[in-house]
Amino acid sequence: MQSLNYEDQVLWTRWKEWKDPKAGDDLMRRYMPLVTYHVGRISVGLPKSVHKDDLMSLGMLGLYDALEKFDPSRDLKFDTYASFRIRGAIIDGLRKEDWLPRTSREKTKKVEAAIEKLEQRYLRNVSPAEIAEELGMTVQDVVSTMNEGFFANLLSIDEKLHDQDDGENIQVMIRDDKNVPPEEKIMKDELIAQLAEKIHELSEKEQLVVSLFYKEELTLTEIGQVLNLSTSRISQIHSKALFKLKNLLEKVIQ
């Protein structure tokens, strides 16, 4: 495990060697901000029916699982290991719950069908306004539906990946890039190139929001402050960008 201060070393020793409950509680409190962070990012665009308190509970289960299974002797930061466990626990919990109502699923299918129809008609990407006009919906309703539908697709993709893994996915995901097989590196580089090409098809503002959110790790509110736009407007831009990228993500795991 990478260098720790003396206090943390004592906590980890008491927890791993003696299973001291107080040390476990102290470590849970110490790393709780990780749970808050991942809940904040995953909850972006989720339906209002999904409560953050429920996500926090799932994330805390993931954090405890990480404390139970982490090996401090490895040259690995606990934050890195715990992040995968926390995110995985939240995604698994969402996938097991029918968090997207049937009416929302039907609406998502209608929007996706309209997009396919309009893109065939105009031979280009279509805007939420054009989709709204086609379906007799408001633009905001279309954007919200796109957002919910995209997250449902992500859960589906995550489930396919989960079904294909060998139980060691976390170890694989956090291994040293130097040990990646050449053929896997080629595939990874090709995927990055495809994503980069697709991202370049986004509008300048969409590219900026995606970069600030995923690379710089700003919140939607912080991005709004940078661009002098409301949080709801940034959320709309973010939703549109992700919707445009989802087809590529789906093709990658087929």
UniProtKB/Swiss-Prot annotation:
- Tell me the InterPro entries matching this sequence: RNA_pol_sigma-70_dom (IPR014284), RNA_pol_sigma70 (IPR000943), RNA_pol_sigma70_r2 (IPR007627), RNA_pol_sigma70_r3 (IPR007624), RNA_pol_sigma70_r4 (IPR007630), RNA_pol_sigma_FliA_WhiG (IPR012845), RNA_pol_sigma_r2 (IPR013325), RNA_pol_sigma_r3/r4-like (IPR013324)
Pfam entry (one): Sigma70_r2
Q: Where is the signal peptide?
A: none
DNA-binding region boundaries:
220-239
Q: Could you state one GO biological process linked to this protein?
A: regulation of DNA-templated transcription
Query: Does this UniProt record's set of keywords contain Transcription regulation?
Result: yes
Task: Please state what the protein is called.
Answer: RNA polymerase sigma-D factor
Recorded source organism is Bacillus subtilis (strain 168)
* Gene this protein is translated from: sigD
